[in-house]
Amino acid sequence: MIENILKNNNLKVTNQRIKILNIINELGCNSTLKNIINNSNGVDTSTIYRTIKTLEDRNIIEEISGINDDVIYVISDSNKHY
């Protein structure tokens, strides 16, 4: 599923992108930046920021407002069917 999302959006499939998308998918409504970083197991923080920016720019993920104005990242509806 995750690899297809990247391929269908003309992005190179990398371990970091797969890992971050899997984390977002698994955490669901708890996928704040802090939780993504805490669950990334060794992925450099700057890589996480760049990857999230790339995924947002390609509309693969989107931001939603959570409790206490936390930003939560979710996989965009247009990519959930992969």
Model-derived regions: residue spans:
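Basic amphipathic alpha-helical segments that dock to polyanions
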Residues: 48, 52-58
